[in-house]
C-alpha cells in the first residue's frame, strides 16, 4: 500500500520542539519529507534542539534567511514553491504562525491540502507580525487543528466551517511525556545552584517587547522587583535578540 506523501515545514525552535514527536510518527507511517526554512538556522537557535531531542536532520534546507522580514517571507514562499514542485506531496503539515508557515501560500496555489496545527490563536493586535501570518494561514488551510475550544470559537467566528476544524489539544503533552525521564535526569538545577521550586524562569524575546527600549526597561524593572519581593532568583532564558539588547543597554539585574 502506497504511503501518504507528507511534507512538514519548520523554521524556529518552538516548531521543532512541539513537532518532535509528530515528526517521529510521520516518519513511521508516511512518506515524510522534513523541510527547514533556514530562516534563523544556527546552533543556539535550532541545531541544539535537534541534538537534545534526538530529531533526525531535515531532508531539505530552503536557506530563507533574508536581509529583512519581507525578504525572508518572499523567500519562504518562492523556495517552498520550488520544493513542492519537486517533491509533489499529498499534504503539507505546518504548525503555528511564524514566517515558515507562509509556505502554505505556495502550497495553496499548487492545490496541496494544508493541515495547520495550532490554528485559531489570536491576540487581536495587527501590529504583531504573527497575528498577520496566523490569519492568512488559518483562512487558506484545508484542515485547521486548534488546541482549545476558545481557538476553535475564534475560527468559527471568522466564518470557517466547523467540519474543517478539528480540536486536537497541544502536542506538548506527548513531548513532555516522552522526554520526562530525560527532563528529570537533567542536572541544570544543581549546576545553577538552585533549589527545586525556589526560582522564577522568564523568557522575553518578542519583537514588540525587546526592540522597544521603553518596554524592555519596564520588564527589567518588574523582574528586579519580583526578585526582591520574594527573595528568589530569576533565571532569564535569553534569546540572541534579548541578549544583544541587554548588553547594548547595560542592564543591571538584582544580585539574587
Task: Describe each region flagged by the PLM.
Residues 1-39:
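N-terminal subdomain of nucleotide-sugar transferases
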Residues 5, 31-33, 113, 164, ...:
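Residues at the starts of beta-strands that form the adenosine-phosphate
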Residues 7-10, 16-22, 49, 61-159:
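Active-site and donor-binding regions of nucleotide-sugar-utilizing enzymes
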Residues 8, 34-36, 94, 116, ...:
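Structural beta-sheet core signal
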Residues 11-12, 37-39, 119, 170, ...:
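Cofactor-binding loop segments of dinucleotide-utilizing enzymes, especially the Rossmann-like FAD-
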Residues 31-72:
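Conserved nucleotide-sugar phosphate-binding/catalytic loop shared by glycosyltransferases and other
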Residues 39, 47, 184-256:
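Donor-nucleotide binding loops and adjacent catalytic segments primarily
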Residues 40-44, 63, 140-215:
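A nucleotide-sugar donor-handling region in carbohydrate enzymes
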Amino acid at each position: 500500500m502506497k504511503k501518504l506523501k507528507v511534507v512538514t515545514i519548520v523554521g524556529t525552535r518552538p516548531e521543532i520542539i512541539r513537532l518532535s514527536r509528530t515528526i517521529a510518527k510521520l516518519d513511521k507511517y508516511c512518506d515524510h519529507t522534513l523541510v527547514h526554512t533556514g530562516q534563523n538556522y544556527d546552533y543556539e537557535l535550532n541545531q541544539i534542539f535537534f541534538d537534545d531531542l534526538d530529531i533526525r536532520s531535515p531532508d531539505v534546507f530552503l536557506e530563507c534567511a533574508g536581509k529583512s522580514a519581507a525578504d525572508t517571507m518572499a523567500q519562504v514562499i518562492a523556495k517552498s514553491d520550488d520544493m513542492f514542485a519537486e517533491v509533489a506531496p499529498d499534504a503539507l503539515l505546518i504548525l503555528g504562525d511564524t514566517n515558515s508557515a507562509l509556505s502554505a501560500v505556495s502550497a495553496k496555489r499548487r492545490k496541496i491540502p494544508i493541515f495547520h496545527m495550532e490554528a485559531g490563536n489570536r491576540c487581536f493586535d495587527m501590529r504583531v507580525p504573527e497575528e498577520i501570518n496566523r490569519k492568512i494561514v488559518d483562512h487558506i488551510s484545508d484542515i485547521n487543528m486548534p488546541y482549545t475550544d476558545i481557538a476553535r470559537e475564534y475560527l468559527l467566528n471568522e466564518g470557517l466551517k466547523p467540519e474543517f476544524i478539528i480540536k486536537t489539544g497541544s502536542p506538548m503533552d506527548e513531548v513532555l511525556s516522552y522526554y520526562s525521564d530525560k527532563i528529570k535526569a537533567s542536572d541544570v538545577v544543581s549546576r545553577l545552584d538552585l533549589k527545586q521550586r525556589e526560582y522564577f524562569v522568564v523568557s522575553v524575546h518578542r519583537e514588540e517587547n525587546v526592540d522597544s527600549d521603553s518596554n524592555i526597561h519596564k520588564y527589567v524593572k518588574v523582574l528586579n522587583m519580583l526578585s526582591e519581593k520574594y527573595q528568589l532568583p530569576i533565571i532569564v532564558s535569553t534569546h540572541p535578540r534579548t541578549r544583544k539588547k541587554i548588553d547594548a543597554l547595560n542592564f543591571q539585574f538584582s544580585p539574587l
